[in-house]
């Protein structure tokens, strides 16, 4: 396994609807993923059965809803969504980017 992530050498994977991601790195217990959104793109509300998630805003801003609590988050802010907690986002600016951390790793992303 390569222990380094080189952003410029890693292409985005287009997910559709104005959302793209890059896998930064992973172990069986942890995964880091950059997720970039076009303005107005929606991270549809959902919950994870088997994963805890921390999402940190790297750039831009998001309207977030975690467990029914709504906030606008900007670069440097984050939210925690323990497993089974509904959460979703709407990008308020073009290029808004999250660094998602999952535990354990998301096998469905590999």
Task: Go through each PLM region and give its residues.
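A short, N-terminal "cap"/entry segment at the start of jelly-roll beta-barrel domains
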Residues: 1-31
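Glycine- and acidic-residue-biased ligand/ion/polar-headgroup-sensing regions
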Residues: 50-62, 67
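Short acidic-glycine-tyrosine-enriched beta hairpin
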Residues: 69-83
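Conserved short histidine dyad/triad with adjacent acidic residue
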Residues: 33-48
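Structural motif
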Residues: 61-63, 70, 86, 95
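Ligand-binding loop in jelly-roll beta-barrel domains
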Residues: 83-108
């Amino acid at each position: 396994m390569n222990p380094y992530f080189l952003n410029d050498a890693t292409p985005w994977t287009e997910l559709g609807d104005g959302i793209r991601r890059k896998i930064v790195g992973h172990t069986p217990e942890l995964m880091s993923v950059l997720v970039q959104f076009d303005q107005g793109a929606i991270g549809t509300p959902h919950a994870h059965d088997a994963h805890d998630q921390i999402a940190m805003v790297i750039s831009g801003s998001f309207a977030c809803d975690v467990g029914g609590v709504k906030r606008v988050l900007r670069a440097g802010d984050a939210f925690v969504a323990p497993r089974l907690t509904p959460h979703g986002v709407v990008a308020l600016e073009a290029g808004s980017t999250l660094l998602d951390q999952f535990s354990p790793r998301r096998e469905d992303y590999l």
